[in-house]
Amino acid sequence: MLNWEWRIENRVVESDLSVKGEDDRAVALYVTFPYDPDTASFSENMMRPFVEIVRGTDAPGRMLSYVWGGFGNPGDMIESPFFGAVNAMIICQNSRAPVGEWVYEETNIIADHERAFGSIPTKVAHILLAADSDDTGGKNRASVRKIMFRAK
């Protein structure tokens, strides 16, 4: 299980997370997983040498993005318009979520990985935080705290 708390300080513009150029979000927590040739698709395995040239041999294979933003519903899973099938975005809070309040999130990353990619991950490679407002021209201010892994 992965849990954390986050909050946004201002209302974000609704955006379509599935479309390049319209995919802004207030904040996202990314969980990356090591590349696994045994569970990777044919195209992932074919692209891997190029990924390693650009990003290095320790570049992750797949990502789950837990997102605050978009106009979908909490729990919706969307394929990344930039990374395609190797990055599944899961809406935790949409653009109508409360502003200025800490929101607790808890998710089963193993179940999410299996739902997104059809396999069970062996370990996590990285946790990353990001925000994106270049398409809508907005300004995001978000905080994230108490990121923690725990047994189910």
What label would you give each PLM region?
Residues 1-9, 125-131:
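A short beta-strand element within beta-rich, extracytoplasmic domains
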Residues 5-11, 34-36, 110:
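Solvent-exposed strand-to-loop "edge" motifs in beta-rich extracellular domains
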Residues 26-29, 85-86, 90-91, 95, ...:
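Extracellular beta-strand ligand-recognition surfaces/modules
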Residues 24, 33-83:
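Extracellular/luminal beta-rich ligand-recognition
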